[in-house]
């Protein structure tokens, strides 16, 4: 897959709630800097975390508005629409990706944390 294909698949699998397929897009030694979950190293750590997404969110959509690809790197501006514990979440976000051998080796996401506060506190 090309970098663009991997990034498209990242959002397709997330929006389908297919977190196993989503995790398959990452290298075993992946590093993620996630706005809410913090610094996450290794696919072995990430995969069980993502297994809980279906329980944490009754609805989760992360829709890309603009994607830029430069070789093995990409960035996306997205909009998140989610529902957790009866609370709707709407937030704009930015994602940065570095790929190695056709898989995501590093990613970071940045977004306003205020819309997620009721979920994080409850």
What are the roles of these predicted feature ranges?
Residues 96-118:
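Short beta-strand edge/turn micro-motifs at domain boundaries
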Residues 31, 87, 103-105:
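Residue-level signal for well-ordered, solvent-exposed loop/turn and beta-edge residues enriched
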Residues 61-62, 89-94:
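Short, surface-exposed coil-to-beta transition loops
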Residues 19-71:
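A solvent-exposed, acidic/Ser-Thr-rich amphipathic alpha-helical stretch
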Residues 82-90:
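Short, cysteine-centered beta-strand-loop-beta hairpins and adjacent loop/turn segments enriched
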Residues 26, 80-82, 95, 111:
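Short beta-strand segments enriched in hydrophobic/aromatic residues
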Residues 69-80:
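A short hydrophobic beta-strand element
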Residues 1-28:
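Short acidic-aromatic low-complexity motifs
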């Amino acid at each position: 897959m090309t970098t663009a294909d991997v990034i498209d698949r990242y959002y397709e699998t997330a929006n389908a709630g297919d977190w196993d397929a989503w995790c398959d897009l990452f290298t075993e030694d992946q590093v993620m800097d996630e706005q809410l979950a913090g610094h996450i190293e290794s696919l072995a750590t990430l995969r069980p975390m993502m297994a809980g997404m279906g329980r944490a969110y009754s609805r989760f959509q992360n829709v890309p508005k603009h994607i830029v690809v430069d070789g093995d790197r990409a960035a996306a501006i997205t909009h998140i629409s989610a529902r957790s514990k009866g609370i709707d979440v709407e937030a704009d976000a930015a994602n940065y990706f570095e790929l190695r051998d056709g898989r995501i080796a590093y990613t970071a996401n940045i977004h306003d944390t205020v819309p997620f506060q009721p979920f994080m506190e409850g």
